[in-house]
């Protein structure tokens, strides 16, 4: 995974703005920049100190195209750990692209997605967990999500993972020495000592995994489907949560046929929301297709919001939806509170773990919906200042480590040889160090950075 070329990319959004930034990184970054940049001081950037700024002009094919400020960073004290130059120029889309073109013509190669952060990882500036959180911070859509990502960048998650890993590594090293050098005077670890270490590691990993599940609604969003029979107010609720008219609302049953999707934020809860066709038996071919799509979409939902018309008695279609939600993470919304309730709300309450009454039309009850959602998703007790897992990859590493720790404890309890216990413990270490990147293969690293945008 060695990086030898000098790369460049636009580091700001592809839109007009106050400034645009073109970033260059690599062994020849300063030499490339000198080919296109002329400082008003008359001195080349090759003579510049690190952490210095220089005003001048950028030229393309010998013709000045913009004024810019060149920021020079010397290895290893840069974001990537390499020599880096950043041109801050005027933020017009055309101008920024021309500056990049000049840099590429001067010898730099186009940077791939996340390549600058990938180089920071490969050069030891950050670990893999911190690298992932850079993208999490960029994509954060709420205060808590941003706080979690920043705390991970600051190293809180890595600190917790490394603490667990090192405690197990110490055990593995001692067990290996005791097994491999029986003639040496190496004290055997007692079963109680091993159990204490493994138990503490298991508790910490279970806490991290639990925190991920509770914080998922904050950091990643929850795949959520709104379901109900026709004309109970599903689309009105979708529009209320979206803050705009995403779904068509009429008095005609069966208006919604396609699945309408929108990512919305309810308080600090991020929902990947889907409004589906009203579920009912129908002879309309197009509507029936929409109903089937709704049922398929429901099958993979992480959260179901079941909407009922409070102004009408429960129907067979309502009962079918109630039965479907049994055993699933679901929230009952009894809508049209502004019209007064006729339906059996006590029965609905008895069938759902979470329940709220509101008027999607007037937004009455919206605050209660936010509170109930937070309780249901576990975000009401979520502490964004604590170290937290921020990706499925990190969670999977912790789950694998936890499984190995449980196997080690089971082996210890059954009285097998300590070298067998050591094998299980070492598997846990492998999983934890894969999380931080110390033992991550090239395929894992490439997958992480493929999700980044170009320029970061």
Locations of the language-model features?
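A glycine-rich (often HGG/GG-containing) alpha/beta subdomain
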Residues: 1-147, 151, 155, 331
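C-terminal-of-GTPase-core extension/linker across diverse P-loop GTPases
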Residues: 2-14, 143-265, 282-284, 313-456
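Short glycine-/polar-rich loops that comprise or flank the Walker A/P-loop
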Residues: 17-19, 51-53, 300-304, 327-330, ...
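Switch I (G2) and immediately adjacent beta-strands of P-loop GTPase domains
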Residues: 54-74, 254-282, 298-303, 307
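Generic preference for hydrophobic
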Residues: 70, 110, 224-226, 249, ...
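Glycine-rich, N-terminal phosphate-binding loop of Rossmann-like dinucleotide-binding domains
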Residues: 89-91, 241, 276, 308-311
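Conserved beta-strand segments of alpha/beta enzyme cores
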Residues: 109, 270-272, 354
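Inter-motif core of Ras-like GTPase G domains
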Residues: 287-311
């Amino acid at each position: 995974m060695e990086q030898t070329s000098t790369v460049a990319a636009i580091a700001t959004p592809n839109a007009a703005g106050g400034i645009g930034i073109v970033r260059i990184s690599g062994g020849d970054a300063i030499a490339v920049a000198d080919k296109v940049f002329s400082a008003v001081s008359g001195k080349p950037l090759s003579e510049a100190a690190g952490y210095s700024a220089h005003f001048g002009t950028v030229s393309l094919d010998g013709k000045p195209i913009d004024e810019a400020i060149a920021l020079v960073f010397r290895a290893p004290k840069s974001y990537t750990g390499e020599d880096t130059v950043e041109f801050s120029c005027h933020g017009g889309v055309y101008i920024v692209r021309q500056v990049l073109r000049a840099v590429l013509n001067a010898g730099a190669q186009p940077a791939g997605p996340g390549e600058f952060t990938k180089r920071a990882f490969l050069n030891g500036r950050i670990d893999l967990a911190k690298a992932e959180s850079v993208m999490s911070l960029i994509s954060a859509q709420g205060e808590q999500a941003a706080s979690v990502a920043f705390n991970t960048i600051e190293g809180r998650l890595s600190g917790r993972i490394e603490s667990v890993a090192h405690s197990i590594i110490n055990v593995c090293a001692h067990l290996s020495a005791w097994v491999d050098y029986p003639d040496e005077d190496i004290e055997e670890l007692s079963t109680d000592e091993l159990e204490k270490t493994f138990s503490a590691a298991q508790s910490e990993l279970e806490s991290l995994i639990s925190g991920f599940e509770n914080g998922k609604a904050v950091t990643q969003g929850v795949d959520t489907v709104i379901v109900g029979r026709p004309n109970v107010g599903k689309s009105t609720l979708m529009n209320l949560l979206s803050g705009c008219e995403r779904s068509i609302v009429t008095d005609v049953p069966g208006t919604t046929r396609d699945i309408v999707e929108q990512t919305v934020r309810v308080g600090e809860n991020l929902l990947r929301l889907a409004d589906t066709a009203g579920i009912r038996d129908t002879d309309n071919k197009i509507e029936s297709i929409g109903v089937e799509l709704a049922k398929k979409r429901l099958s993979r939902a992480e959260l179901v919001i079941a909407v009922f018309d409070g102004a009408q008695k429960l129907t067979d279609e309502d009962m079918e939806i109630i039965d479907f939600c049994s055993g699933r993470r679901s929230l009952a919304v009894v809508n049209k509170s502004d019209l007064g309730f006729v339906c059996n709300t006590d029965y609905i309450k008895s069938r759902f773990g979470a329940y709220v009454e509101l008027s999607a039309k007037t937004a009455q009850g919206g605050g209660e919906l936010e509170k109930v959602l937070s309780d249901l998703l576990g975000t009401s007790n979520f502490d964004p200042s604590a170290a937290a897992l921020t990706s499925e990859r990190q969670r999977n590493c912790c789950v694998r480590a936890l499984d190995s720790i449980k196997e080690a404890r089971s082996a210890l309890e059954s009285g097998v040889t300590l070298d067998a216990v050591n094998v299980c413990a070492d598997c846990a270490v492998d999983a934890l160090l894969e999380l931080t990147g110390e033992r991550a293969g090239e395929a894992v690293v490439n997958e992480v950075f493929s999700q980044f945008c170009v320029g970061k």
